[in-house]
Amino acid sequence: LVPYISLSFNPLSIFFSFLVFLIGLTTNIYVLNYFKNEANESLFIFWLNCFILSMVVLVLAQNFFTLFLGWELIGLSSFFLINFWNIRRGTLKSSFKAFTFNLISDLCLLSALCCFYLESNTTDISTFLFLIFNNFSASFYLTTGTILLVICASIKSVQVGGHLWLPDSMEAPVPASSLIHSATLVSAG
């Protein structure tokens, strides 16, 4: 089991990649006016584009490792975007709250992917789905993995119970809030 990055270019993943890039482009254009004369504008743009690239990696993922890598990079980028104005009093607290909830989500995803691997003995998403749909049986690993995946998605997409980090993360600059809390992150969930 050697981790490697594998991307899938099919019509659905290309469409969602285009959607992520389009939302990212409009956010980048907005940032140029929002941060006029801001000293750390380039740092913010760096983390913003890391977030966008992470979303694209997540959408194009062909195997569990690439999916998890994109998922983790989204969490890391979110942390730095929320904590961008770290001179504000509540910013560090809110960024760690978001980080903690995302860490719980990450552990659920990692556990779910391990369950799926134990069930199918593959890390390729297409092969996994083919095996599950053609040889479906409600096994312990599949059921546990599915439940963990629902918990993971609920936290990341701020559903009931996993939404507690969202209001505090509004400490981030407006462009970060708009990107993180728009359909891009909800789509990831």
Model regions: which residues?
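...captures the hydrophobic TM-helix bundle architecture rather than a specific catalytic motif
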Residues: L1-G189
